[in-house]
Amino acid sequence: RRRIGSMVEGRPDWVLSRQRAWGVPITLFVKNGTGEYLQDPEVNARVIAAVREHGVDAWDEGRKAEFLGEAYNPDDYEMVADILDVWFDSGCTHAFTLESGRWPALQWPADLYLEGSDQHRGWFQSSLLESCATRGRAPYDQVLTHGFTMASDGRKMSKSLGNTIDPLKVMEQYGADIIRLWALSVDSTEDHRIGDEILKGAGDQYRKLRNTFRYLLGALDGFIGDMGDVGEVPELEVYILALLADLDGKLRHAAENYDFNAYTRLLVDFCNEDLSAFYFDIRKDVLYCDGPGSVKRNAYRTVLDLLFHALVRYAAPVLVFTAEEVWSTRYPDGGSVHLLEWPQVPGVTADGARWAQLRELREDVMEAIEPLRRDKVIRSGLEADVAVPASAVPEGFSDADLAELFITASVARGDSDTVAVTRTDESKCGRCWRLLPSVAEDGDLCDRCEDVVATLDGAA
């Protein structure tokens, strides 16, 4: 708005006429000798009828007498031979698209005008001036401008420079969804670059999103369930649902404001940071090793089901083909994902500050584990006994909770200001690979796995 306003404020007067042989004629008659323009509704009506039937070529010297009618002497008037500036033509597009009646679903004014950033002094402005002069307001409610695509080095693409990129070849190499992901990931308000390395980055993002859906499809295979009252769900699941509700609100806001860069960033970050690197990582033990009747496992899969239905809808405008593939894989007879409504997610809340503190401590623990893993003292966090500063632990988490959330053998609280890690002396369960006091020696089963195996054997 500011940019258009400043350009309108500083622009000179607009000369609408052009001396060209081809274009939209200025259908006026000028009185010889006085230069006075003829203003007669009946004359105008005859001109309009002729143009409507025969096009702009109807404005011809041979029809002067027909247009003027019996009330005027054709020899007293001259037909204007000038045409309208083509920018005036473009500025009238709102009239013949939104008011012609040919497309009843379209209404004036337009919801949105979309064009390149150069149109602030072009189409956006010509449309604004024409509409304000004839209708007293802008022909659009909103304007969205898009920057131009530049070569990877920031230069304008040019055949002479040999730096042009053929979208069809890019699609053959990367696929249409990766191009869409790239286009929606850039800041559309500015000029943006494209090249092999940039597209490879978009490809990496795409694979992470695709892997999220692949995990969800595998984890939900054969799932039929309902977690019931959210208050009965494990706290981690409540937290993830709260994150989903927060994401939903932010994505709605981004979509409503055409902030597609933020939309894709929020979606990718949620899948990578909150799901793959956090939630999925923590709950894989429950998914793979708990029994079919496990309350925690059922709660996890129920949340995964909610995540699936939300994420596939969120991804559909960005990854149109992948989202359709994902949806039809789980629901072969479920129609198209692109005909689904926006998801309705549970309005769940959680103490975000408390969980942020917990996740910060988790990062500290993972950083402290890494040197031991790199030096082959331990192979994973499951072999680590961890001591954390008591002051860094949020209220409400037991040591067992922390061990589960940090994916370690054990967690204890101490007076130190830093995280300390040692290799545990416990033995490793042969089924879940956790190192626990209940395992007598490596390869034996822990109490949980013994119960699960016994249940499965009994049901066989």
Show the residue positions of the predicted features.
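A broadly conserved sequence feature marking short terminus-proximal activation segments
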Residues: 35-45, 375, 383-427
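A generic structural motif
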Residues: 1, 61-63, 142, 339, ...
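Cys/His-rich zinc-coordinating "finger/knuckle" motifs
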Residues: 436-442, 453-456
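Short metal-binding segments enriched for Cys and/or His
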Residues: 175, 454-459
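Structured secondary-structure scaffolds
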Residues: 1-223, 240-283, 287, 302-313, ...
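Acidic, turn-prone loop/beta-hairpin segments
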Residues: 30, 77, 222-252, 280-390, ...
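Cys/His-coordinated zinc-binding microdomains
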Residues: 433-436, 447-450
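Short metal-coordination and nucleic-acid-contact micro-motifs, chiefly zinc-binding Cys/His arrays
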Residues: 425-428, 442-445
